[in-house]
Amino acid sequence: MPDSTVQQPITDDTELRRKNRATVEQYMRTKGQDRLRRHELFTEDGSGGLWTTDTGAPIVISGKAKLAEHAVWSLKCFPDWEWYNVKVFETDDPNHIWVECDGHGKILFPGYPEGYYENHFLHSFELQDGKVKRNREFMNVFQQLRALGIPVPHIKREGIPA
């Protein structure tokens, strides 16, 4: 009697994981003028942005053309920015990678004095076949306020055993 069991193809995510991780690592090590080409790591409809802001609403830049424009702005405002202490974490989903890192450099926002900005960051990368579909950046917005010389309120947390 013939075997009527349908064989399911074996899927191996190893190559996809390698490709996606290489993209994330390239994104995180990109510095200087090379940042003007970082949008090439994204899908055509890809997005990136800052999910922790002073308004509470994310700043999202969508599409390769807008990401290219954002790179010009970013290089002007953060001319010597670099990520360091980069740790890459793969997840159960080969298309989702998290990064924990630190970043530092000059901050040159119009209307504020030149400052030096340091912060700790988390990045969520959602990928599609080795290209970034969505990058979300999370950081402590108070550190950016301090770097711009903006007074930060103090929260009284009485009773916390620290």
Swiss-Prot record:
This is Phenazine biosynthesis protein PhzB. SUPFAM superfamilies: NTF2-like (SSF54427). GO terms for biological process: antibiotic biosynthetic process. The keyword rRNA-binding does not apply. It comes from Pseudomonas fluorescens. Belongs to the PhzA/PhzB family. The keyword Nucleotide-binding does not apply. Signal peptide: none annotated. Keywords: Antibiotic biosynthesis, Virulence. Involved in the biosynthesis of the antibiotic, phenazine, a nitrogen-containing heterocyclic molecule having important roles in virulence, competition and biological control.
